[in-house]
Amino acid sequence: MSEPPRFEWHGPKAAANRAEHKVTFEEAATVFGDPLGRIAGDPRHSEGEQRYVLLGQSNRRRLLVVMFTERGEAIHLISARKATRREEREYEEGEA
């Protein structure tokens, strides 16, 4: 049995994300538990490190887009926001 992922983030960035997008990083971390979640690479924002985008449902039943990178054994959250209507359709149709 594998250990659950460990999450990390910068406090000021988490506060700014909450103010701008009304999504806490604590909620964003729960999206990683969505079995229907979709992860894609984010080459446009991957200068210096590989970044990824996760589209999935949180424990509050909100569909979120979470940007993250892997740092050692941890998942480093960069930002999180509510999915757009287009992203909602992609998720529902299994295209993300």
Explain the meaning of each model-derived region.
Residues M1-A96:
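Ribonuclease/tRNase effector modules and their secretory precursors
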